[in-house]
């Protein structure tokens, strides 16, 4: 028998698990507790339909006559902030509409939260991983990489002199 309980306290999930073997017999009762802290995943806020204005306009660019005469470009405007997003990624009007709405929610999130937005967090995570890779390579290879770079720069300097 396995009993599990989850509680949400201040954006932190605490998981508790209780293993019970042969609950009827008091002597053979065994239980294990563990707690783990996990942050809740970042959720983009849903935009209100009243705040969004959608229009479909004719496409521009390569694609010939078909793209120039059909209205497949989705243009979505967030009225309170004035942010406008266009999408012409696919040939389908509905897919372009979905893509434009997704981009608009990301832009509004970035506008409202700044460095705390989803895109900023992704960039911070990428920068952090890049620094970790560089640190690991320096630990592994030492100054060999720096020596190679300096020798290349010295060779270029010698060629400039000649």
Curated annotation (Swiss-Prot):
Any transmembrane segments, and where?
none
What GO cellular component is one of the record's annotations?
mitochondrion
What protein am I looking at? Uncharacterized peptide chain release factor-like protein C1105.18c, mitochondrial
Name the keywords, alphabetized: Mitochondrion, Transit peptide
Q: Where along the chain is the transit peptide annotated?
A: 1-18
Pfam families, sorted: RF-1 (PF00472)
Give the family from UniProt.
Answer: Belongs to the prokaryotic/mitochondrial release factor family.
Organism expressing this protein natively: Schizosaccharomyces pombe (strain 972 / ATCC 24843) (Fission yeast)
Question: Is Flavoprotein found in the keyword set?
Answer: no
Renumbered to this chain, the Basic residues biased-composition regions fall at: 128-142
Q: Which InterPro entries match?
A: Mito_Transl_Release_Factor (IPR052405), Pep_chain_release_fac_I (IPR000352), Pep_chain_release_fac_I_sf (IPR045853)
| Gene Ontology MF terms in the entry | peptidyl-tRNA hydrolase activity; translation release factor activity
